[in-house]
Amino acid sequence: MTLQEDIIRQLGVKAVIDPKQEIRQSVDFLKAYLLKHPFLKTYVLGISGGQDSSLAGKLAQMAIEELRAETGDEQYQFIAVRLPYGVQADEADAQKALAFIQPDQALTVNIKEAVDGQLRALETAGLEISDFNKGNIKARQRMISQYAIAGQTAGAVIGTDHAAENVMGFFTKFGDGGADILPLFRLTKRQGKALLKALKADPSLYEKVPTADLEDKKPGLADEVALGVSYQEIDDYLEGHTISAEAQARIEDWWHKGQHKRHLPITIFDDFWK
């Protein structure tokens, strides 16, 4: 088995999908998790206005609505959370996403004061924090807020990680990578786009240039620029196609470097890192 084949197997990627079937699978998955854990009543998800949170949010709202209809339990709720750092430049996109999702509840938690307070505390301790590191602090603060909301509402936190991000390790460890359930896991970026099209989302939600937008000095930095490889190449690789040797080497290098992100804290019995 080649490394490419092994990665495809580990991430559960299909070369060809039926978007409607994948939508149903994700919705049923989200429903089944709550039914298996009757003490859980809500799903919580941060909404940025990009493709991934728009899709995950819509799937979550669909699952919750079906659960309410099937069980008669009105405690089932989906809570969408806006988590800007100060003023978000693309706030209009986030509002479009909320209009598409139509969440049961929408909260806004501005993380700027918490992030800046943490930076001041670190600087007082004698540490100068880089802009890149600050970006990771933002990502982790967003998860602190989501877990606080989930803790108060008997909820579970949804993550937006999908196969194209996972293979590249393109998420913050214990930040956006720290979630309870991943309804998009197995899908490539283009497959996620296909699901949004099937759900009749506004094209602006899936045609927008993907960006983590964490760094103050590089606002709106495109994912593909940060990664040095295009999503088309990543998706082709994950769907089993042949790509350039250079792109394949870069993807596989990111895969190896990001292995620690795909594991719980390393124990003495782990050997994947050796």
Curated annotation (Swiss-Prot):
SUPFAM superfamilies: Adenine nucleotide alpha hydrolases-like. Keywords: ATP-binding, Ligase, Magnesium, Metal-binding, NAD, Nucleotide-binding. Pfam families: NAD_synthase. The keyword Electron transport does not apply. InterPro entries: NAD/GMP_synthase, NAD_synthase, NH(3)-dep_NAD(+)_synth, Rossmann-like_a/b/a_fold. Coiled coil: none annotated. Belongs to the NAD synthetase family. NCBIfam families: nadE (TIGR00552), PRK00768.1 (NF001979). HAMAP family: NadE_ammonia_dep. This is NH(3)-dependent NAD(+) synthetase. It comes from Streptococcus equi subsp. zooepidemicus (strain H70). The lineage of its organism: Bacteria, Bacillati, Bacillota, Bacilli, Lactobacillales. The gene is nadE.
